């Protein structure tokens, strides 16, 4: 698949290190949780989750994202996709718990909106390092109750999302969707495993991609061999039992990198 040329129509600074880029194309059939391969010309092609059907929300972390941050409205980048498996939509009347940390709120926000539109009850646990790093709080508040936690206590509960979860009855939810830094997701995984609700949960993983379509195997996770780009990036909690989650990932050479 050749990349389409996407022209930037609007840039919103969500926090000092996070920006949302709107572009002049809508992926009408996207599944919330799917990703696109973003071609930053002259640098690299990298995977990014869709925060709407016409936007990506980007955290500045490396060469490709730093180059993206140099772009202005009217500039363009290449897009391929959407690819992968998204989150499972709930049935009408089901209860959905969103657990979002940092920029992990980006792919979860369209899922929360789609779940609400399907007639589900949607509650959110939203975590970040500090108040200025909270992402899409207003979007989640428009759908249901939001429990906020910040590492420094600048807003909401002082602590981590797992500290908030201790005060919730997670067994009362029909579906639980999780995305955020992998250390956070690993903690949430253990919490949900202890309460025997992994079968209700789904996690969105981030790994190094090369092809993005399931051919090269660069993003396979141990021990199952599941491909994050094709079989994921969203996996059920039970699929991740005994996996590398929270332990290590792999770099471009295939070498293990401790998380």
UniProtKB/Swiss-Prot annotation:
<dbReference type="Pfam" id="PF10418">
    <property type="entry name" value="DHODB_Fe-S_bind"/>
</dbReference>
<dbReference type="InterPro" id="IPR001433">
    <property type="entry name" value="OxRdtase_FAD/NAD-bd"/>
</dbReference>
<dbReference type="GO" id="GO:0046872">
    <property type="term" value="F:metal ion binding"/>
</dbReference>
<dbReference type="Pfam" id="PF00175">
    <property type="entry name" value="NAD_binding_1"/>
</dbReference>
<comment type="function">
    <text>Responsible for channeling the electrons from the oxidation of dihydroorotate from the FMN redox center in the PyrD type B subunit to the ultimate electron acceptor NAD(+).</text>
</comment>
<keyword id="KW-0285">Flavoprotein</keyword>
<keyword id="KW-0001">2Fe-2S</keyword>
<feature type="binding site">
    <location>
        <position position="211"/>
    </location>
    <ligand>
        <name>[2Fe-2S] cluster</name>
    </ligand>
</feature>
<dbReference type="GO" id="GO:0044205">
    <property type="term" value="P:'de novo' UMP biosynthetic process"/>
</dbReference>
<feature type="domain" description="FAD-binding FR-type">
    <location>
        <begin position="1"/>
        <end position="89"/>
    </location>
</feature>
<dbReference type="InterPro" id="IPR039261">
    <property type="entry name" value="FNR_nucleotide-bd"/>
</dbReference>
<feature type="binding site">
    <location>
        <position position="229"/>
    </location>
    <ligand>
        <name>[2Fe-2S] cluster</name>
    </ligand>
</feature>
<feature type="binding site">
    <location>
        <position position="219"/>
    </location>
    <ligand>
        <name>[2Fe-2S] cluster</name>
    </ligand>
</feature>
<dbReference type="GO" id="GO:0016491">
    <property type="term" value="F:oxidoreductase activity"/>
</dbReference>
<keyword id="KW-0408">Iron</keyword>
<keyword id="KW-0249">Electron transport</keyword>
<dbReference type="InterPro" id="IPR050353">
    <property type="entry name" value="PyrK_electron_transfer"/>
</dbReference>
<dbReference type="InterPro" id="IPR023455">
    <property type="entry name" value="Dihydroorotate_DHASE_ETsu"/>
</dbReference>
<comment type="subunit">
    <text>Heterotetramer of 2 PyrK and 2 PyrD type B subunits.</text>
</comment>
<dbReference type="GO" id="GO:0009055">
    <property type="term" value="F:electron transfer activity"/>
</dbReference>
<dbReference type="InterPro" id="IPR017927">
    <property type="entry name" value="FAD-bd_FR_type"/>
</dbReference>
<dbReference type="InterPro" id="IPR017938">
    <property type="entry name" value="Riboflavin_synthase-like_b-brl"/>
</dbReference>
<comment type="similarity">
    <text>Belongs to the PyrK family.</text>
</comment>
<dbReference type="InterPro" id="IPR037117">
    <property type="entry name" value="Dihydroorotate_DH_ele_sf"/>
</dbReference>
<feature type="binding site">
    <location>
        <position position="216"/>
    </location>
    <ligand>
        <name>[2Fe-2S] cluster</name>
    </ligand>
</feature>
<protein>
    <recommendedName>
        <fullName>Probable dihydroorotate dehydrogenase B (NAD(+)), electron transfer subunit</fullName>
    </recommendedName>
</protein>
<keyword id="KW-0411">Iron-sulfur</keyword>
<dbReference type="InterPro" id="IPR012165">
    <property type="entry name" value="Cyt_c3_hydrogenase_gsu"/>
</dbReference>
<dbReference type="GO" id="GO:0051537">
    <property type="term" value="F:2 iron, 2 sulfur cluster binding"/>
</dbReference>
<keyword id="KW-0479">Metal-binding</keyword>
<comment type="pathway">
    <text>Pyrimidine metabolism; UMP biosynthesis via de novo pathway; orotate from (S)-dihydroorotate (NAD(+) route): step 1/1.</text>
</comment>
<dbReference type="GO" id="GO:0050660">
    <property type="term" value="F:flavin adenine dinucleotide binding"/>
</dbReference>
<dbReference type="InterPro" id="IPR019480">
    <property type="entry name" value="Dihydroorotate_DH_Fe-S-bd"/>
</dbReference>
<keyword id="KW-0274">FAD</keyword>
<keyword id="KW-0665">Pyrimidine biosynthesis</keyword>
<keyword id="KW-0813">Transport</keyword>
């Amino acid at each position: 698949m050749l990349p389409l040329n996407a022209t930037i129509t609007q840039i919103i600074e969500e926090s000092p290190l996070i920006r949302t880029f709107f572009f002049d194309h809508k992926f009408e059939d996207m599944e919330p949780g799917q990703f696109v391969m973003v071609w930053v010309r002259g640098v690299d092609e990298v995977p990014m989750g869709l925060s709407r059907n016409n936007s990506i929300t980007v955290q500045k972390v490396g060469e490709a994202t730093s180059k993206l941050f140099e772009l202005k409205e009217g500039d363009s980048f290449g897009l391929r996709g959407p690819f992968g498996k998204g989150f499972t939509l709930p049935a009408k009347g089901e209860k959905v718990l969103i657990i979002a940390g940092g920029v992990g709120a980006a792919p979860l926000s369209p899922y929360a909106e789609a779940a609400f539109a399907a007639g589900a009850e949607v509650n959110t646990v939203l975590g970040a390092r500090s108040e200025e790093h909270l992402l899409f709080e207003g979007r989640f508040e428009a759908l249901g109750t939001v429990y906020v936690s910040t590492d420094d206590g600048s807003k909401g509960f002082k602590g981590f999302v797992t500290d908030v979860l201790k005060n919730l009855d997670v067994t009362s939810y029909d579906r639980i969707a999780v995305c955020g830094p992998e250390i956070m997701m690993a903690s949430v995984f253990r919490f949900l495993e202890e309460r025997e609700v992994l079968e209700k949960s789904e996690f969105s993983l981030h790994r190094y991609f090369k092809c993005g379509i399931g051919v090269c195997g660069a993003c396979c996770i141990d021990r199952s061999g599941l491909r994050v780009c094709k079989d994921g990036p969203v996996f059920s909690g039970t699929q991740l039992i005994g996996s590398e989650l929270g332990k290590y990932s792999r770099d471009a050479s295939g070498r293990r990198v401790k998380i």
